[in-house]
Amino acid sequence: NKSRKRRNRVSFLGVTTVEPPKPIPLTWKTEKLVWVNQWPLPKQKLEALHLLANEQLEKGHIEPSFSPWNSPVFVIQKKSSKWRMLTDLRAVNAVIQPMGPLQPGLPSPAMIPKDWPLIIIDLKDCFFTIPLAEQDCEKFAFTIPAINNKEPATRFQWKVLPQGMLNSPTICQTFVGRALQPVRDKFSDCYIIHYFDDILCAAETKDKLIDCYTFLQAEVANAGLAIASDKIQTSTPFHYLGMQIENRKIKPQKIEIRKDTLKTLNDFQKLLGDINWIRPTLGIPTYAMSNLFSILRGDSDLNSKRMLTPEATKEIKLVEEKIQSAQINRIDPLAPLQLLIFATAHSPTGIIIQNTDLVEWSFLPHSTVKTFTLYLDQIATLIGPTRLRIIKLCGNDPDKIVVPLTKEQVRQAFINSGAWQIGLANFVGIIDNHYPKTKIFQFLKLTTWILPKITRREPLENALTVFTDGSSNGKVAYTGPKERVIKTPYQSAQRAELVAVITVLQDFDQPINIISDSAYVVQATRDVETALIKYSMDDQLNQLFNLLQQTVRKRNFPFYITHIRAHTNLPGPLTKANEQADLLVSSAFIKAQELHALTHVNAAGLKNKFDVTWKQAKDIVQHCTQCQVLDLPTQEAGVNPEVCVLMHYGKWMSHMYLHLGRLSYVHVTVDTYSHFMCATCQTGESTSHVKKHLLSCFAVMGVPEKIKTDNGPGYCSKAFQKFLSQWKISHTTGIPYNSQGQAIVERTNRTLKTQLVKQKEGGDSKECTTPQMQLNLALYTLNFLNIYRNQTTTSAEHLTGKKNSPHEGKLI
């Protein structure tokens, strides 16, 4: 037994070999038998299955079986019209303990020393030349049924690795690896790559390569493996693992991407997976594939429809062009590798080089985990994995890392950036900023936004200070040298605050210090200048972040932004100023803004009705475009020698904003004591129209003792005098050419017309669709809201002697 365990050297083709590797047993999760019935097969497929089984039986790959295990077997016809036998091993795989992958990635052919001669071989039917452990064979039994059960079924079991078995790839790698280990031991100075059934040998001289290959042939045969004689490559160009290998250059094999099959998410996912696999050779920066990556966004259903956009089509064309022209280099095993980091658009690009020879490209993923990733952090994030990649390729850290930073910026990065400290941990090589002089990298689209230029980390001296605030009702405001309030559609306080900061950055073209009570917005604004913004399914948020970044980058002057806690009651000017900004978006201020937008009430009326300051009330009116254009300097309402009601009627000419139609005769009444006014739209100016107007006035103002009118026919008729007599009203008319009463009426007309125009053009009320409704809204504003010069109450309060307040009862 001991002699059997010792290495037993035998002679084969004149070369000393060792005992072949033994079969590798499987580990089972359970001892429970697995039996899946064989389904019926058509006669044609059944005949093909019998032929294939006999062929495998003759080759010794299967043997007759009486196993209590069974898996279904079937055949498929290949394009060549030949049949292929497959076994459905899903049920058996479920009870096998997985071994795990041994080669999680492809070996890089760039590590093959340049100018070394090569031989590449392919093992023939590798799975079928590797034996199963004897105790595992019965688990892979299958049945060939008979038509109509006219005879017993024929049963076989596999003696070699069956295709579709969970651990067949791992066992194949292990078995071939053990067969090649004596070759590696004896020819340690040769470079041997083994990936499944593909084997590449390189040696410094052709004689050394021949010796190595001769020994390898013997070891492969001794292990029971067979070399495919028609696939032996001994001259350039070599084809290995999808690459075309020459003496010094390596190129991707020429392929054409089919675009007509790209219809679903699954199609694009596979395409981009294949492109990503070859990108380290092609050198396509992340920014050049943004539109292709964007197609993967949206519905996660693999069958969800996707469309190839014109921009993405151009990017596929770029990939095809790179496949035709891209190349990397085989290395000099004695020279160290270096890492170059280029500040490309979107995210940095890494390049592994040796002297000036390109070895491999390195990129960051298109999407990030964090909402904002600083460009400096992206550089550090790229350096870390690329260092590990270089160690994986050659076993050593890069000799030098070249970055687009000055020595002082590198020093500051080590002090302030945690990502930088992690990415360059334990690095003992050189950090430089001098790039090699070569045209290889000139096509890269570089960015200048590496470190902040506009954003400052310390407060600016001799700069304006502006406080911002946003509310969940969509109102945003800032206060400082001037105040501004904006209504936005956002129902999030943070998004409203973001709009406030953007507005400040746009409005102040000078150095500024911004103080906000949103820590989230402050951090976002600090980082956004050089950050990669993570895509969000929220389009609204994407637009805000992109607008913030564009606004910051377009500025000509620096800014500083910091956070202040709201509602702390701390003493000092900062807290007070922040409260002032809060007040601008508070409920009282917002209600004042909304009322003015509806009615265009004057500043005194706003101050009287709401808990706002004079400055805030005036600012609301001054920021109204209608009130700025139409408001004239405030005049006193005029004085009449006696207290009475003045009446006037006249036809109003059609105004561009007032379409009165048939109701173009506006009758106006004004109380000389309170200046309370009442007006109605009528179709004429006869006595009947005057009486109708007065009854409307009585319903609002009550019945007056005196009425003063002009000498119009509607006021001098007997019918009108009889009407006044019934209501016990004294009537007088104005003295011709005496303007005391007439001036009040004319000013009232002008005030009413101006108010109507303002509300019609700039009011928020969409319900006032008829002339009388428009007139009533104007009268409500003038009587119940506005306060005029030298007055402390509204006209309605002056008339009744009571303070206006919301009605507490119900209108029935």
Curated annotation (Swiss-Prot):
Residue sites binding Mg(2+) 1 per the record: 469, 497, 517
Binding site for Zn(2+): 596, 600, 624, 627
Domain (Reverse transcriptase) ranges: 57-245
Keyword Nucleus: no
Source domain of life: Eukaryota
Pfam family, any one: RNase_H
Catalysed reaction equations from the record: DNA(n) + a 2'-deoxyribonucleoside 5'-triphosphate = DNA(n+1) + diphosphate; Endonucleolytic cleavage to 5'-phosphomonoester
Gene3D superfamilies recorded: 1.10.10.200, 3.30.70.270, HIV Type 1 Reverse Transcriptase, subunit A, domain 1 (3.10.10.10), Ribonuclease H-like superfamily/Ribonuclease H (3.30.420.10)
Claim: Transcription regulation is one of the keywords in the record: no
Keyword annotations of the record: DNA-binding, Endonuclease, ERV, Hydrolase, Metal-binding, Multifunctional enzyme, Nuclease, Nucleotidyltransferase, RNA-directed DNA polymerase, Transferase, Transposable element, Zinc, Zinc-finger
InterPro entries: DNA/RNA_pol_sf (IPR043502), Integrase-like_N (IPR017856), Integrase_cat-core (IPR001584), Integrase_Zn-bd_dom_N (IPR003308), Rev_trsase/Diguanyl_cyclase (IPR043128), RNaseH-like_sf (IPR012337), RNaseH_domain (IPR002156), RNaseH_sf (IPR036397)
Zinc finger (Integrase-type): 587-628
Limits of the Integrase catalytic domain: 637-803
GO terms of biological process kind: DNA integration; DNA synthesis involved in DNA repair; DNA-templated DNA replication
RNase H type-1 domain mapped to chain residues: 460-590
Gene Ontology MF annotations: DNA binding; RNA stem-loop binding; RNA-directed DNA polymerase activity; RNA-DNA hybrid ribonuclease activity; zinc ion binding
Chain span(s) of sequence motif YXDD: 195-198
Residue window of motif LPQG: 161-164
UniProt-listed Enzyme Commission number(s): 2.7.7.49, 3.1.26.4
Binding sites annotated in the UniProt record for Mg(2+) 2: 469, 582
Function field: Early post-infection, the reverse transcriptase converts the viral RNA genome into double-stranded viral DNA. The RNase H domain of the reverse transcriptase performs two functions. It degrades the RNA template and specifically removes the RNA primer from the RNA/DNA hybrid. Following nuclear import, the integrase catalyzes the insertion of the linear, double-stranded viral DNA into the host cell chromosome. Endogenous Pol proteins may have kept, lost or modified their original function during evolution.
Comment, domains: The LPQG and YXDD motifs are catalytically important and conserved among many retroviruses.
Leftover remarks: This protein is synthesized as Gag-Pro and Gag-Pro-Pol polyprotein precursors. These polyproteins are thought, by similarity with type-B retroviruses, to be generated by -1 frameshifts occurring at the Gag-Pro and Pro-Pol genes boundaries. Exact N-terminus of this protein has not been formally described.
Family to which the UniProt record says this protein belongs: Belongs to the beta type-B retroviral polymerase family. HERV class-II K(HML-2) pol subfamily.
Protein name (Swiss-Prot/TrEMBL): Endogenous retrovirus group K member 18 Pol protein
Origin organism lineage: Eukaryota, Metazoa, Chordata, Craniata, Vertebrata
